[in-house]
Amino acid sequence: MAKIIVVSTDCPYPANHGGRLDILMRLELLSSTGHDVDLIVTYKEEIDEASKQYLERICKNVYYAQRLGMIRSAFNDMLKFLPLQVKSRSRLREIKLNKKYDYVLCESEYVYSILKNSTLDAKNKLLRVHNDEVVYYKALFNDENSIFKKIYYFYEMLAFKYNKKDINSSFDKLLFISKDECDKESKGIWLPSHIPVMHPFKYDKFDLHNCNVLFVGNLFMPNNLQGLIWYLNKVHPMVIKENPDIKLTIAGNAKNGISEELKKAISIYDGNAINLITSPSDEELQAIYDGNCIFINPMLNGAGVKLKNLDAMRNTMFVVSTSIGSEGTGTNHGEQLVIANDEVLFAKHIINYSKNISGMKEIAFNAFSFIQENYDSKKVFSSIFKEN
């Protein structure tokens, strides 16, 4: 079996947003199939002991590298026009490694600095491409209201564009989450997220919770926030006017607290109408999925595959999404989900399907089956390892 070192942009546990989920599922897959897996975690905030213990159970060795703050990152390597996301992880160069690896798997361009580590000895270099970073930061720039943050996003967009060719050429293979982006790259391999179905399809919950609507996603990124605020301001008033029994739960990582704009959007509703759950654990998140039926993804801007839809589908959810929210997943309107790009149609789907339990079950089951059949990375990794 292969010796692999995975370099993560963040602590992947708890997996309370899509990027973490993608990394954690891959770690668990590689470990469970008998590979010798080491892990480097780059982090901003201190990692709790429970998270460390979980990662140490599935990985042979776990290394930790604290990220530099924004100001220190800006002054680090000032003569190099590198993204601050890369500069902030420059301590990857200093970690002392003492093994020879068959593969180093970098979870995004952010951890590119590990290739500058003189103690890294890896035969093959793999890059997991989570997003087209240029498109991603352009979308964040468009969604952001703060001038300071807009400047930051604009800088990152330009820096990733400037360095893209050099970074990509440093790797032997590029493992794309998006099939569309993969097709544009000669070194590309499509590696769909490993999203194994952990529980059987839960038919009964549609009879019990047909009026319960759920949003799960990190609550600090502008594209999530703007989509959610659009839903709260434009869509949900129409939904509860038609059906006052419908309840909304918002759950997600809130590492920077709740934005004032989101608080304001929530405040227009009665106290019991919206349930806000910040930074749920994996166990809490499972209970949240089990107590809701209709999952919403109202993203209006963004790049890459939105794993929140796929995670919802494997957890027996009926998904209502914008086109942006569903892109790159291979799912189709009316088969695995329903799509709406304006507030009237978005509200109409929620209202109508909350009354059409059999229709909701059928689409949710199609989505559940789709995840079972298409989102297993074992075959792709097997073919990669056979080539080398």
UniProtKB/Swiss-Prot annotation:
Entry-linked SUPFAM superfamilies: UDP-Glycosyltransferase/glycogen phosphorylase
Protein name as annotated: Uncharacterized 44.6 kDa protein in cps region
Domain of life, per UniProt, equals: Bacteria
